[in-house]
């Protein structure tokens, strides 16, 4: 039986954490957030000695650890953490569309080539100024036959694989073609074969 001064039952556990009150079904809603059911202001009771809780539809709820969650939000989990929707995860390299390569241009800790044989990190912008080269342009300059100054692709004659490789086989047919990353494309163009 509840003590005299404790009319709502115990509000915390033995460690001082708030206890999750009953009065909801706990079912997962349409977008992964807990939804409350019942009429606004309905009192739900389970006997005389049980905790009586007033359920208000649309009120902010807390999870089982007392962390407030967002009711009706997309992707909230049992800890009240809001997830993101529509994301596909991260990939292991490359530059996102619209991003700059400022972090990659410095060369951070790799081998650095000294002398005049290295390529410049900027080029003429055609209007009397300079513009920073992207990583794509730098790689093109380093590849055999690179550094043409134009960004147009030249078609490879049928039957020639370019750089001594043969094209053909089931792996390169259009119906079984896999999307290749930028690193795979660079590795294919480097002399020395497929690593």
From Swiss-Prot:
<dbReference type="InterPro" id="IPR000167">
    <property type="entry name" value="Dehydrin"/>
</dbReference>
<dbReference type="GO" id="GO:0071482">
    <property type="term" value="P:cellular response to light stimulus"/>
</dbReference>
<dbReference type="GO" id="GO:0005829">
    <property type="term" value="C:cytosol"/>
</dbReference>
<dbReference type="GO" id="GO:0005737">
    <property type="term" value="C:cytoplasm"/>
</dbReference>
<dbReference type="GO" id="GO:0010555">
    <property type="term" value="P:response to mannitol"/>
</dbReference>
<keyword id="KW-0963">Cytoplasm</keyword>
<keyword id="KW-0597">Phosphoprotein</keyword>
<dbReference type="InterPro" id="IPR030513">
    <property type="entry name" value="Dehydrin_CS"/>
</dbReference>
<feature type="compositionally biased region" description="Polar residues">
    <location>
        <begin position="50"/>
        <end position="64"/>
    </location>
</feature>
<feature type="compositionally biased region" description="Low complexity">
    <location>
        <begin position="37"/>
        <end position="48"/>
    </location>
</feature>
<protein>
    <recommendedName>
        <fullName>Dehydrin DHN1</fullName>
    </recommendedName>
</protein>
<feature type="compositionally biased region" description="Basic and acidic residues">
    <location>
        <begin position="173"/>
        <end position="195"/>
    </location>
</feature>
<feature type="region of interest" description="Disordered">
    <location>
        <begin position="1"/>
        <end position="195"/>
    </location>
</feature>
<dbReference type="GO" id="GO:0042631">
    <property type="term" value="P:cellular response to water deprivation"/>
</dbReference>
<feature type="compositionally biased region" description="Low complexity">
    <location>
        <begin position="65"/>
        <end position="88"/>
    </location>
</feature>
<feature type="compositionally biased region" description="Basic and acidic residues">
    <location>
        <begin position="136"/>
        <end position="153"/>
    </location>
</feature>
<dbReference type="GO" id="GO:0009737">
    <property type="term" value="P:response to abscisic acid"/>
</dbReference>
<dbReference type="GO" id="GO:0071472">
    <property type="term" value="P:cellular response to salt stress"/>
</dbReference>
<comment type="similarity">
    <text>Belongs to the plant dehydrin family.</text>
</comment>
<keyword id="KW-0346">Stress response</keyword>
<dbReference type="GO" id="GO:0005634">
    <property type="term" value="C:nucleus"/>
</dbReference>
<dbReference type="GO" id="GO:0009631">
    <property type="term" value="P:cold acclimation"/>
</dbReference>
<keyword id="KW-0539">Nucleus</keyword>
<dbReference type="Pfam" id="PF00257">
    <property type="entry name" value="Dehydrin"/>
</dbReference>
């Amino acid at each position: 039986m509840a003590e005299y001064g404790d009319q709502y039952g115990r509000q915390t556990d033995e460690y001082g954490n708030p206890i999750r009150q009953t009065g909801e079904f706990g079912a997962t809603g349409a977008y992964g957030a807990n939804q409350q059911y019942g009429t606004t202001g309905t009192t739900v009771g389970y006997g005389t000695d049980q905790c009586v809780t007033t359920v208000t539809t649309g009120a902010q709820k807390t999870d089982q650890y007392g962390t407030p969650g967002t009711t009706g939000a997309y992707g909230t989990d049992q800890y009240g953490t809001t997830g993101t929707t529509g994301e596909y995860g991260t990939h292991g390299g490359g530059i996102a569309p619209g991003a700059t390569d400022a972090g990659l241009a410095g060369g951070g800790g790799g081998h650095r080539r000294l002398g005049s044989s290295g390529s410049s990190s900027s080029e003429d912008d055609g209007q009397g100024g300079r513009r920073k080269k992207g990583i794509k342009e730098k790689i093109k300059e380093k590849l055999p036959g690179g550094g043409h100054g134009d960004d147009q692709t030249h078609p490879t004659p049928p039957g020639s694989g370019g750089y001594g490789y043969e094209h053909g086989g089931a792996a390169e047919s259009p119906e079984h073609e896999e999307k290749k990353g930028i690193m795979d494309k660079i590795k294919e163009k480097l002399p020395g074969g497929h690593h």
